[in-house]
Amino acid sequence: MAEPVPPHDDFIDGVAVKDVVAGENSGSRFRIYLPERNDSSVDKLPVILHFHGGGFCISQADWYMYYAVYTRLARVANAIIVSVFLPLAPEHRLPAACDAAFAGLLWLRDVSRKQGHEPWLNEYADFNRVFLIGDSSGGNIVHQVAARAGEEDLSPMRLAGAIPIHPGFMRSQRSKSELEQEQTPFLTLDMVDKFMELALPIGSTKDHPISCPMGDAAPAVEELKLPPYLYCVAEEGSDKRH
């Protein structure tokens, strides 16, 4: 699952993949998935901006588990996927990953304004249909980026929706589901605690707004200008913490 998959310009199973750097000095890196198109098609494609999971400490946008999921999504949804290479803790503590993710959204906005250039996006992207998606800690980032986007002029681009997939929302106090959930070697509560200790700003607890956007320290959801959300949470999953 954690093996990196190299990009390929050829369409393999209907999808081509390339890695790009946005700007010479920004250091922002993205992986772009482009579905193969019918020669007669003139319709532009929606854009899905993806933030990977990994507890803010592990994982990369080019790992096989993401390649497998997002090549399929690009093909089935007929959408362009743009996945952000996120800076990882503890070398880069939060909000570094959120800042990089938001920079990715602003890069898409710049391309939509012709202030940036990316051939696949310039030719095929429908910037009126841009969505955010992220799994686990990437779901937390989806919420942070969506909240910031509400205070930003994104025109002519439009943020059409956000999809947090089993977001890693939690509190300092263990939830009922955390206490009842059977632990596995793949992910234990101690591992989650360690990830948060390494990722959150020094001195912060899991009640920090990034890990606990429903807590008292976070702005009220009613006060945020958010796009439509589709939450994906598995029953009996370890992320039913709120």
Where are these regions (language model features)?
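Cytosolic, low-complexity regulatory segments enriched in Ser/Pro/Gly with interspersed Lys/Arg
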Residues: 1-3
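Alpha/beta-hydrolase superfamily serine-hydrolase fold, recognizing
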Residues: 5-242
